[in-house]
Each structure stands twice: as C-alpha cells, then as structure tokens.
C-alpha cells in the first residue's frame, strides 16, 4: 500500500510468521489472513497495527458493517477471502450460518451486534452517557462500544445508557432501523420479563406503508421490473469483479513462481514505474501493469499513481510541503512492455492478456442510521461537554477558601450540575475560590497554580445553571486567576484497569499518552542553559554537559513537520552534548507529536568529538535533506523543517527581573504596579496558550521575529489563494507550511485547514500578539544587569517612556473621566468602566517625530485599546502599522493605526474577563487633516490626493456640540447621539491614519471592567 490510511482497520496476508495475535498471543502464520486495529503509537507521531488472527479479531468486539469501505486492503484479497470476511462481518465473526428452513421462519441465525450490548448494572458506579444520572445496581442497562481517540490502545469500551435514553439516541448511536433488542449481545441472559419489556422499547422500525388509496395500477409492477433489472445489473457486476480478481491473482501466482523479486523490480523499472518497498507491493504493481497497462505519471505533479481499494491515488508531492491529492478511477496508461530477456521464460511465452480497464465496485456509503465505525467520532459528546442541564458533566471541581455556601451546599450544587467534588489539585478540572485566596497564594493555591488549573468565582455556579452562554464564555467571565489552561474533562467511564493499557509505555518516553483535552501548558520543561543553548532535560545530562558550539554554530536543532492529510504534527530535536569536565560526547535526539507526550528519545555516547559531529550532521541531513553547514535551506518532501528557536543565555536575566520587584524602586506606586502588569510573564504565557501555541516546543519569546514574519507572508498567500479560488491542494500546502513554522498544540486532533477568512484573521491576530510578546520578552532579557537597581526600575528604563501619575483631582483627570463616562456605547452593556489610574506619557523621540503634523488641522484626542501583553511593545516602539508581510484581511480599511471616539469600542480590544478585569487603554493625539469618509469596508493602500486619514462613519457619534478643545486638539467627549448616517455598516466611528508619525500618545489609563452578572 502506497500511503498510510485514515481507516481504522486493515487486512492482508501475513508477510512473515513473526507477528503475534494480540488476542491469543500465538504467532500468525505467513500468508494467512490477518486483521488489524490501527492505534496511535506511543513512540512516534503515527499509527501502528495491532494484528489478530481472522477468527480472533471478531472475538475482541470489533464490529464492521462494510468491509469494502472500512477495511484498508480488503479489495486486494482473493475473492473467496473477501466473501468470507463479508460473511463474518454480517454474523459477528461466525461462518457457520445456516439458511432458511422450509417454512422460511426462525431458522436463519440472527446477527448478534458485537458493538451493542445489554445487561444488568453490576454496581452503582456506572453513569448514563445521555442523562448523566447514575444507573442503579441490578437495573437493565444498554451499551454502545466506542474507541476513545486519546486511548485507542484500550480498544472497544462500553458506554452505558438507561434503556429509555438509548431509545432516544438510537439514530445518533448508529442503531439501525432494522435492528431490534433481540440483536443486542447479552439479550439472552436477561429475564423473560425484561426481554419482553426491552423488545417493546426497542423494536425494529419498519418503513412506512402506503395507504390503500395511494396505490396506482401498474406502479408495483414497474417497481418490481426495475428492481429486477437493478438486481441483474448487480449480479453481472459481481461476476465481472470476481473474474477480474481471479485474473489478477492468477497473474500474481504465476509471477511468484516464475520471477524473483529482482526480476519484478526490473519489469517495473523497464516500464518506468516506481519501485515500492516490500515484496507484496512490488508484486501488486507488476500484476496491475500487466493486466491493465503501465500507468503514466500524474498530470498534476508527475508522481506515481497507485491502486488503493476504490481508486488510483497519486503518491507524489505538489510541493516540498504537501502531497498530491489526485485520485482517479480512470488513470492514463500505456501498453505494458515485457523486455526481450523475459520472453524466454515459459510463463511470458504463453502469456496473452487482453488489455482492459479496471472495474470498481459501486461506491457504497454507510446508510443513514447505520452504525459508524468506532472511530474518534464514536466517542460520546459528553466527553467534551455535558447536556444542557448537566454542564459540569465529567468535571472534577476543587473548592478553596471561605465561600458564601457551606461545603455540603456547594457539593450538592456541583453534583446537580453533573460534576464531582475533589480535594486534590492535580485531579481537578476547575477550582472555585475567591479573589482574596488567589492573591494570598497559600500552599494549596500554589498547587492549583502549579497544576495550571483555572480559578473561577462562586458566581460561576449560579450563572452556569441558568445562562445560555457557553461553558468557555462563562469560564472567561468569572476567571479569577492569571494562570490556567483549557479546562480538563475526565473520560466518561472507567475504561480499563487502573495502571494498565494495551500498549506498554517505552522506558525512554516519560508518562502516558496525553489525553485529548488535557490542559495545554500542564507540562513545563525546565531548560538548563549552558553556552549557546538549553540542554534538553530528558537527556538526563542537564547538570553535567552542555551543547557543543563550534565555529559560532550551536549543535542543536529543533525540527517540525506537519501533514494535515495524514493528521501528523511532528517534532524532532537533535543535540550534540559535551561533558562539562571530561572529553566525553553524546548525541541526544527526541521525537514525537507536538502538544502530547507521544514520542520517545535516545541518548548515544560517541567515541570522540569528531565521531559525534559526523553522526550529528548525518542525522540532520537524514531528517531534513540538507547539509548541516548549508547556508540556504531547501525544504524537501516528507522531510523536516528547522525552527529558528532562540535558546539564548538570557533566561536568568528574566528570572532576576521578576523576583521581588519593588523593594528598592523610587517610582510612584501606581507606576510600579503598571510596570509589573506590563511585564507579567504569566499573562504572556496565558495569551500564547489561548492561541493554541505549544509552549514546550516554542517556549515564551523563543521564536525568532524573522520566522513570525515568514508566517505573516504565508497568511498573505492564504488570503490571496482564497480570493482567487485556488485549489484545495494549494490551501493544504499553505496550511502545512504555517503550522510547521508556528508550532501549535492540537493534542490528538488534526490541524485545521486555513480555508476561510475567519481562520486567517484569527491567525493574524495571533501573530500580532506574538510580535508584541517577543518585544516584551526581548526587553526583559536585554539591557542593564545592574543588581543594585530594582527590577521595576530596570524594566521602566527599557520602555524609554516618561510615565507620570495624573492627579485625580486635576482638571485634565476630570476631562478624561468625563470622556470615559460619556462615550460608553449603549450596545456595550456587558460591563461598566471604572478609571483606576491615569498616566501622562511621553515616548522618547515621539514629539519630535510628530512635529511636522502639529500644524495640520483637525487633530483629535482618540481612544486605542489593546491587550496588556502588547503594551511593552507599544510604549517602547509606539503604535505600529501591520508589517508588509501581513495579509490585509481583518483590517476594514487596510493596514493603518485605528482609533475610536467611543471608549467602549476601543475597550473591547483589551480582552479582559471577570477573573482578569483590569485593562489598559491609550488616548492619543491623531493628526487627521482632511478625512476620506467611508461607510463600508475598503482596502486602502494609498489615500486619495489631498486626504490625510480615513473616517469610517458610524450610526452613533459623540454629540459634536459638547466637544471641547484643549491646546488646539478636539476632545469629542459628548454623549452618543445619532449621526444621521443610516446606510453604513458601522455602529460607531473609526479613524485610521497610515503614517506612524501622525500619532502622538498622550495618556495611558488603567481601567477596571465591572462586569454585570447575567440575569437570565
């Protein structure tokens, strides 16, 4: 087979006698049929087969409805073996099925559904996966077997339901209309009374019959004739498929007798066909060519086409990043030619095959209501979110501190909502506490922080029971902690014996396979920095060795490879380590799937430094296709790409600047608090986790600016491709490139395609924030190492901005507070704004830069909001225009600096929450001059002659009669009134300048967002 498949099952003739059956543990003889269940490897980013004898496969509990669709390799079997497997699929593995008796009733063996069952609850521990209520001991319960995507090695696992709940979800669970209670495995062990009850609850559903009056003469006869014609056609096709299969296998059998493997390779090469690996694959390709003709190269990429079940698939690559997606049932061919030297072989002398086209079985798809194969999709929805009345299903809640309700009341509320109470931090999905407890950060709260569990207020419990908002929205609204990743949800059922699994974990890899939904920054890698790079702690040598540096080049590489089609999201890390004291050298490498602990590592001690360098360079070239010292890297198909990750020596500087700040600072307390807020490393990490950035493969501040700019360029290409309606393979190629450059943590999920404007816009926003975080972190790492100075003062100096606290009783403070109060838009009613502090700011060199525009008419004091993590970049470098590499999508009027005259319009860009309600917002003087007024989106790359800015006209505007002028600058602080402009797509005004020199930042406000509690 040419490429790995997404199919869950596989069948083939055993290539050797080495494989053992996972069921009976006996060896599987060579050339006998073996069937496999494909599972995610714990050792690398890919799937491996768990092989079974044909008879053992069905005993495990696997259920297949359409072997020709669900099983990889099915069509390559001999015809009789295909029929055997079809029969076993219908009967749950039995082949001794008798036909109907003379009366045609009752003598046919009924199929027992292996993936559906009935029985009595053995305890009170099981929970119905529909209503989430307990199933009492001794009560009848029904099951649907599923495969959990995060634990595929466990195989088929029972998910239990009350009979009534099962009936309600019948179609969703794939219990087909023709099935009834009698088909359930275990039905016969129920009492006669329970059997009768269940038969009434779960009967076979017959098709709706016509009313007598609806029958029209002749219709039934036509239907009968039509069905007979169709049946004859099916029989004819079946005979043709059998004849074709027999012919192919006859050719293969004769070739095996007449030719060696090398002979078969020569035949392929002579006919300009690629030679695959594996004897059986070579034989398949030669037989295909001899029967149907030699395949011509793919028209799109010139790759090799290969037969795979339902069509011929291209195995080539459209680019170095992406495989070709061509699939056809009618490939172009030429005549198969047998070389002269082969014509002396007796088989080839008498060989006469009439050239023909390959016949394919009709495209069969699983009927509506049929049981879907037990893949990731089969896992019940409750794993991720509970039913509306049980929103905390499968979640464990930890409570800390004094709450308004006592512990029993809180426990009752949580259990009513489907959750469970826990006293252990590392088992918790969520923590409910108070702001006071979070600020106090006692030992228990430290454990919560270490486990990276979100902390929410008690109000969360009240809102979730009545609110129509999603769980994630409510979590954000009530969040109290600055830390916390995605909420963990425990699997819905105890899916196997504790501490055991179907696959033994490698001694080299650390920990079990990560569960989907596990929090994304839970595992923190401590990097020991020596010399030019961080020593990987998994090597066990972080305290004894360092990464070799020679000729200015650090012998450490982090590589990435993403293939959305295959679902892989892989990394490979390579390091050459040198002992700190002795002349000893090691090569350390680790590999796996990004964002999970799937993977392994290897440490090899080398005889000498020269051997170590040679081995390192050999491995690097093997993985990337490029020489280590090559100046211009060229990406090769199916090869890794290097990530420019800067493991500089500045990590200790960051630690120094974040330990005990404020003890020696002489700055005013509000300014000290502002600096701490701007340089808060935890907030930066939280922002990266929100964007699904992998903090292990791309630690904070480590991705280079150049690589971020390259990612912008890819997004620009995506936008262009979408607007031009480019091919799917082009979009796929760009998506693969983007995710390789910027490592994302998708767990076990496939990386999503960047195939719409919204996904591009979201990634642009992510890169904007990454750039600012990169600036903030660079500032933290660089500059003065004067230990006599307070860390806050050191960071303050790096901003190169004079920051003064504005007296709350001053006139300018009064004007600003009035501006905040009056311009809060009526539609932005989820919160009120409270001014905490006002700072007057003067960026170094900005007033000089602004001087030419000081004389321009129409200067206004306007709002600009942004995330707290962006302010180190804003204050140190000013408000900037998106880089040239960035796509124009997401910018309503092109790339520029955007302002608003309504405070809440800008405040929405602060991205605060109830748990993190403090935001920062700017007031900047913008030299607008002559404004180009627009009502709808338009990409502006160059302003019309005589225009200095753009104004997006909104339906609401501050009352112009209430505006005031301060030092020649208009302050539009009137309350919102109708602008009289109705045919506009904007609710509120927007102002855009396209030259950074037209902006002079004046004030920075610290605002508290007082979120209003939901009333519904």
UniProtKB/Swiss-Prot annotation:
PADR1 zinc-binding domain residues: 228-362
Residues modified to PolyADP-ribosyl glutamic acid: 409, 415, 437, 446-447, 450, 458, 473, 486, 490, 493, 515-516, 522
CDD domains registered for this protein in UniProt: BRCT_PARP1, parp_like, WGR_PARP1_like
Residue numbers bearing the N6-acetyllysine modification: 100, 108, 134, 602, 623
Residue ranges annotated for the WGR domain, each copy included: 544-640
Motif (Nuclear localization signal): 210-212, 224-229
Modified residues (Phosphothreonine): 596
InterPro entries for the chain: ARTD/PARP (IPR050800), BRCT_dom (IPR001357), BRCT_dom_sf (IPR036420), PADR1_C_dom_sf (IPR038650), PARP (IPR008288), PARP1-like_PADR1_N (IPR049296), PARP1-like_PADR1_Zn_ribbon (IPR012982), Poly(ADP-ribose)pol_cat_dom (IPR012317)
Site (described: Cleavage): 217-218
Protein name: Poly [ADP-ribose] polymerase 1
Name of the encoding gene: PARP1
